[in-house]
Amino acid sequence: MTNTQINDKILELANYLKIDNKCVAHNARLQSIQINGAVIKNFSFKLFNEYKLSFFNCKFLCEINEAPGFFEIENPVYIYGCTFEENVISYNIKFKSNVVIAYCRFNKNFYFKANTFCNSSNFERNFYNYASFKKSHFEKNVTFYNST
C-alpha cells in the first residue's frame, strides 16, 4: 500500500468515525491503524473487516448497536482504556481473530448476544453497569481481569 493510499484510508476512516484525523496513526510494520485519544461519534464493529484497528484512550459518544444479522470479523479487535458513554450491544458477530477489550469503562449496558469468539479473548475491565454474554460461544480461552 502506498503512502497516498494509506492517507486516503486514514482520512476515510476519520470521516466515518467523525474524529480529527490527527488522532489516527498508521503502523506499517504491524499493518494496522491506531486511533489515539479520539472522541468518536460513529462506530461499527464491521470496521474491523476492512482494517486492523486499535483504539487507545478514546471516548465513544455513540451507541454501538450491531443489529441482528450475522457477519464475520476477520481482523483482531483491540480496544484499550476507552470510555463508552452509551450502550454497547452486539448480536450474531463471529470474531475470527483475537478480541481484546482492556481497561475500559462502560457507563451503560454492555451486552453481547449470540456472538462467536474463535480465538483467545481478553476482557480486562470494570463493569459499572450491566454486562451480559448471553448465548455467546467461546472456542478458545477467555480471561476476565479485575471485573466487578
Language-model features: where?
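N-terminal leader/targeting and pre-domain segments
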Residues: 1-148
